[in-house]
Amino acid sequence: QNQSSAASDVYKRQPLSEDLVRHMVLNSLRSYKTKFSKDFGELVLCYDDKHCWRKDYFPYYKQNRKKARSESSLDWNELFDILTKIQNELEENFPYKVLKINGAEADDIIAILSNKISSTPNLYEEILIISGDKDFIQLHQSDNVKQYSPTLKKFVVDENPEQYKFEHIIRGDKGDGVPNVLSQDTVFVEDLRQRPITKKKLIEWKENGIPEGEIKRNYQRNKTLIDFDSIPNELGELIYNMWVDKITQNDKSKILPYFMKHRLKELTEKLGDF
């Protein structure tokens, strides 16, 4: 255990290798495509925009992540620059739809497309979300939506996605800086303790509704930030239209020159997987 954490610390202090990151990203995409394209069709890559509508609505959204990154020995700005460069290369050289929308997170794109495809008969098909993020469990309410965690290497399953969403809104999301409904907006940025929510309260609120006043206000705050049904309508339309307008090119002629340019010999031998 100590050896592995020491090794990761040494790795973190070294400059990031663009070539290594590129190989890891491409090899992951190759793996997902070979594993899942037969059952789930084309690969659609969704990216976060730097600007996010949730941040406009709630200034403390994901605020703690900045703090964690500034304290990390990994150069996050360099990593983001490399990933942005690779994103542009994918759009230029590979036959996949690459989607990024001003003001939207990747989650918004995934949610809007999943809901649209699930609710439109002539679009309806099986969807696989490749992410371990439990925010997506609420989308499992549609039978055609499945989720696979690349970290755990297994499907994410929940018995009751509707109940999961309700509890998620009530409890908030510490990782995203969203407090529970009994806690004030600034609870995480001020390093305060949240007021705990009992199982009894959850059952009571589910049966009788959310009480008026501060709790109702906080519930609305969390619903706006967590419930994908709260994504602004205009943003949803932009996302859907961009997806429709992006034509998937079946042209793979740029992949080999791209691999050769970046000396991706190992992947050149697996060209057919892309």
What are these regions (language model features)?
Residues 54-60, 138-142:
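A short acidic (Asp/Glu
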Residues 1, 48, 132:
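Cofactor-binding loop segments of dinucleotide-utilizing enzymes, especially the Rossmann-like FAD-
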Residues 17-25, 102-107:
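Phosphate/oxyanion-binding active-site loops and adjacent basic polyanion-contact surfaces
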Residues 49-53, 134-137:
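Short, solvent-exposed loop/turn segments at secondary-structure junctions
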Residues 39-40, 66-274:
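Extended two-metal-dependent nuclease catalytic cores across DNA- and RNA-processing enzymes
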Residues 1-11:
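Single conserved hydrophobic/aromatic residue that forms the stacking wall/gate
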Residues 21-40, 89-91:
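A short, N-terminal amphipathic alpha-helix
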